Design a protein with these regions (language model features):
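Flexible hinge motifs at transmembrane-helix junctions and intramembrane kinks/re-entrant loops
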Residues: 61-66, 177, 181, 191-239, ...
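Generic transmembrane alpha-helix signature in multi-pass membrane proteins
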Residues: 50-54, 104-112, 138, 162-169, ...
Length: 342
């Protein structure tokens, strides 16, 4: 796609259309349709970390549900902070936030030795550390010339391939992982996305991923592969209780390990920010990067208070922006609202 944006007014495709900018405000129905597309693209990755942590800590199902609820709620808050911005916090770019997988190993080790309260104590301190060092770390942006940026964008796509393959197989841990049914449904969904993207016009073409997800899920349900019984039995409304597992405790070895995780997150965020900046034609300089990293820090701190985890940009949504060509940060802000409501 390069830097050529793909956006439709009526049935006419336009390149670099002035209404398709990072600050474009789309009609409300389009905002939430495109926003839902982003949520569905990141949902499985968003809930994976709380599931892994809960299993490692042998938490009951009730606590797992609380972790997932808190995670999605904080994902929404973090996304709104990043997309809308408040003062010098938030990059004001279409960057959806989710829990970083880099934190899984350290959190499970901290939890096994010191319990959940030590996990959240380490997360809170690491978030505060990230917020404070953001302006200093952002100076490293000069180490990211175009050749490095291009390499980062390529690596983002390559690193997402195993994720796509695992999901097509049915998800790691699924007893039917790799079955012909799962793989066939995955390819069928992929073909639907490609067909809609290639042959549909206007608004529908931009929603190719969402249409593919809905069609694939409907086919899976008709085949008896998708089961929504647990959804029907679950509570429709849940409230987030800060410090549900108790007031945070602070083990400094645990804090140090989480700070190291956040250093990795800052590098990852730098690459994702530059990639998004290239896609949406908004150059990311030192000032902008510092704002993005501050948002990661404050979101991680909030996560520690609300029983969630460290936050970073989700790379699969970077790819989705490139595929759909819809640059508006308000689309991703709508995703944040949807995540809060979930």
């Amino acid at each position: 796609m390069g830097n050529i944006s793909r956006f439709y007014v009526g049935d006419t495709m336009t390149d670099q259309n002035p209404i398709n900018t990072v600050d474009s405000m789309l009609p409300i129905p389009q905002l939430f349709a495109f926003g839902l597309q982003h949520v569905l693209a990141m949902y499985a990755g968003a809930v994976a970390v709380p599931i892994i942590v809960a299993q490692a800590m042998n938490l009951p199902v009730e606590d797992l549900i609380r972790l997932i609820t808190a995670d999605l709620f904080t994902c929404g808050i973090a996304t709104l902070i990043q997309t809308l911005g408040f003062g010098n916090i938030g990059g004001r770019i279409p960057m959806i936030q989710g829990v970083t997988f880099a934190s899984v190993g350290p959190m499970t080790m901290i939890g096994a030795q010191h319990g959940m309260t030590a996990i959240y104590g380490a997360i809170i301190v690491a978030g505060l550390f990230t917020f404070i060092v953001a302006p200093f770390f952002s100076r490293l942006i000069r180490l990211f010339p175009p050749v490095v940026t291009g390499t980062i964008i390529t690596l983002i796509g390559i690193n997402l391939m195993p994720v796509a393959i695992n999901w097509m197989g049915g998800g790691v841990g699924n007893p039917e992982f790799g079955s012909y049914t799962n793989i066939g449904l995955g390819f069928l969904t992929f073909l639907i996305v490609v067909f809609v993207y290639k042959f549909a016009k206007g608004f529908l073409s931009n929603l190719s991923v969402l249409i593919g997800l809905i069609a694939g899920t409907a086919i899976a349900f008709a085949m008896g592969v998708a089961n929504f019984d647990e959804v029907g039995r679950s509570q429709w409304v849940a409230f987030i209780e800060p410090f549900y597992f108790g007031l945070p405790s602070f083990d400094w070895a645990s804090v140090l390990s989480m700070i190291i995780v956040m250093l990795v997150v800052m590098v990852e965020t730098t690459g994702d920010s530059i990639a998004i900046g290239e896609i949406v034609d908004k150059p990311i300089g030192r000032k902008e990067l510092a704002s993005v990293i501050r948002a990661d820090g404050i979101s991680t701190l909030i996560g520690g208070i609300l029983n969630s985890f460290p936050y970073t940009a989700f790379a699969q949504n970077v790819g989705l922006i490139a595929v759909t060509g819809v640059k508006s940060r308000f689309v991703v802000a709508a995703s944040g609202v949807i995540l809060i409501l979930l």
